[in-house]
């Protein structure tokens, strides 16, 4: 089956490049569209204590850093990137909204294979929320012996 529009969900870690390369290799033979999305999962909702931080300035800085990182990934993809999206909130809902709006037929995301990722896997949540094909790519941190 040839996909028409692949959405790459990235966390902006160095491994995001691996996901982009994988999606581009799948898209090229069929001239499929490729888009990037980063979802800033809002963990502040889970924290009920007081924080003495200027959240407005911090959110602006984070937004700028996210935009810059997505732009860099897009420019280094070696393939045209249709959309570069950034959202915040519930990962599953943000992806579902993007899937509908941009007619996505494949979501590609990574899964870090460490203890915390196994315990709090985003992939598990997505499997129950996203109703298009998904490709979950196992990612290993450099400390685990993966060579460049």
UniProtKB/Swiss-Prot annotation:
Mind telling me which CDD domains this protein's record contains?
USP-A-like
**Which of UniProt's keywords are assigned here?**
Cytoplasm
Query: Keyword Cytoplasm: yes or no?
Result: yes
Q: Which domain of life is it from?
A: Bacteria
Q: Where in the cell is it found?
A: Cytoplasm
Q: Which SUPFAM superfamilies match?
A: Adenine nucleotide alpha hydrolases-like
Q: Which InterPro entries match?
A: Rossmann-like_a/b/a_fold (IPR014729), Universal_stress_UspA (IPR006015), UspA (IPR006016)
Assembly and interaction partners: Homodimer.
Cited function: Required for resistance to DNA-damaging agents.
According to UniProt, the name of this protein is Universal stress protein A
* Organism annotation: Yersinia pestis
The gene is uspA
């Amino acid at each position: 089956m040839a996909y028409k529009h692949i959405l790459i969900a990235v966390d902006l870690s160095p491994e995001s490049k691996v996901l982009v390369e994988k999606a581009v290799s799948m898209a090229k033979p069929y001239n499929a569209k490729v888009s990037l999305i980063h979802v800033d999962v809002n963990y502040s909702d889970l924290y009920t204590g007081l924080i003495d931080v200027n959240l407005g300035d911090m959110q602006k800085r984070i937004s700028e850093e996210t935009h810059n990182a997505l732009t860099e990934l897009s420019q280094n993809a070696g393939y045209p990137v249709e959309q570069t999206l950034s959202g915040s909130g519930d990962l599953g809902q943000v992806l579902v909204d993007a899937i509908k709006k941009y007619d996505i037929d494949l979501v590609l995301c990574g899964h870090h294979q460490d203890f915390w990722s196994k315990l709090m896997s985003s992939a598990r949540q997505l499997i129950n929320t996203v109703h298009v094909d998904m490709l979950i790519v196992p990612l290993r941190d450099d400390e685990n012996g993966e060579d460049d």
